[in-house]
Structures are given as C-alpha cells and as structure tokens.
Design a protein with these regions (language model features):
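Conserved active-site and SAM-binding loop architecture
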Residues: 1-215
C-alpha cells in the first residue's frame, strides 16, 4: 500500500508491500502469503528466509472471520440469510467454519514463525470483547485504539494491535489533525486487502511503533 510505504519511508524505514493481490497497482511483491506462512511454519524455503530480526512485519490480517458480526452469520440471523432454509444456513456454517479455521491457523502459524525467527511482528485487527482472538488466542493485544478518528481516520471502529518480539511505546507526539467524515465498513472477501488512511497510519507510527530492549 503506497500510503503506508510513504509514511514509513518518511520516518527513515525501507518498506515493501507483500500481498496476494495488486488491485491498486501498488504491491511490490505479489505472492500468496498464506502459502508462504505455511511453508515457513513447516521449515521449508519461503520469503521469511530473507526476513531477519532487524526487520519488522506489519500484518494487516484479514478480519472478517474474527470480528463480532460473524456471529450473526453463524446463527443465520443477519438480514441476508433470513429467507434461507435451515439446510442452507447449516451448509453456510460449514463454509464459514472452514474459513475461520484457515484464518486462525494462518495467523497463529505466522506468530509462531516470527517467534522462532525472532522477527518483530505487529498485527492489526478490529477490537471487541467478542473478537475471536480476544476470546481464543494465547497472546493478548497490547494496544487498543478505541476511536481511530482522533488520529485522522474515517472510521471510529476500535482497533487492537499485537506486538510480538517487540514492545509498544506509549509516548504521544501531537500534530495537527486532518478531520475526515466517518464512513461505514462493509464485509469484504476474507483475504482481500484493506484500504489505508495515511493520516491515521502516520500518527500510529509517529506515536511510537515498537521498542527492542527499551530502544527503538
């Protein structure tokens, strides 16, 4: 994502975007990251062989199977499923559960790979008390941003961040804000890329992305 790379580079970091898609013509390396994570977990050759503990991975992991709205889909009570038969709903449950299982295994294997290789990893995902990783993951998030519009984003939606092999800094650097009208978020393909707001990203990075041993 060009905005993310630009903001990282403005702080002196070299940044590359890896993604399975290139829908905005901004991806540096188009690759199936899920397959690469699986290969790295199985200790096979993968892109993780070229990533060291001096690098940092920022993972904007697909969230649509983890967030609380998915419960309505599992129960068949969301508007789009109200006219479905019980059989259709149950078949859909099987599909959702397979996708949830894939997402959960992949994000967990990503964390394990980074722990093994001592690679700093920061994972971003929506926050709620019913978020699947909040309830069923061994590693708790370390930062919860309850109102992203305060950092110039379009969305207020609470967001959480996991820090693995690194620690967050909590210092605040105040800059003038660029206020944006709030927008609603709809469901997307489970593996699709997010669109980023550069103002929020810059403020989140400037707030202090991580420290190692007390130093950045």
């Amino acid at each position: 994502v060009e905005h993310l790379k630009m903001n990282l580079k403005s702080f002196g970091y070299e940044a590359f975007d890896y993604d399975i898609q290139n829908e905005f013509n901004e991806t540096d390396i188009v690759i199936d990251l899920f397959k690469e994570i699986e290969k790295a977990y199985d200790k096979q050759k993968s892109i993780f062989d070229n990533i060291t503990e001096k690098d940092t991975i920022l993972a904007f992991f697909p969230c649509v199977r983890f967030e609380n709205q998915i419960e309505l889909h599992f129960r068949g009570t969301c508007n789009s499923l109200k006219k479905w038969s019980d059989e259709q709903k149950l078949e859909y449950d099987l599909k959702l559960h397979r996708e949830l299982d894939l997402m959960y295994e992949t994000i967990t294997k990503l964390a394990i790979v980074c722990i093994r290789k001592k690679i700093p990893l920061i994972i971003e995902n929506p926050y709620s008390t019913t978020h699947y990783l909040v309830k069923y993951w061994a590693i708790p998030s370390k930062i919860v941003d309850k109102d992203r519009t305060l950092r110039g984003d379009y969305f207020k939606k609470p967001t959480q961040y996991w820090f693995i092999n690194c620690e967050p800094k909590y210092n605040m650097i105040f800059e003038s804000y660029s206020w944006n009208k709030k927008k609603n978020i709809g469901h997307t393909n489970p593996r699709s890329k997010k669109k980023f707001n550069s103002t929020r990203i810059r403020k989140q990075i400037h707030k202090g992305i991580y420290t190692r041993g007390g130093k950045r």
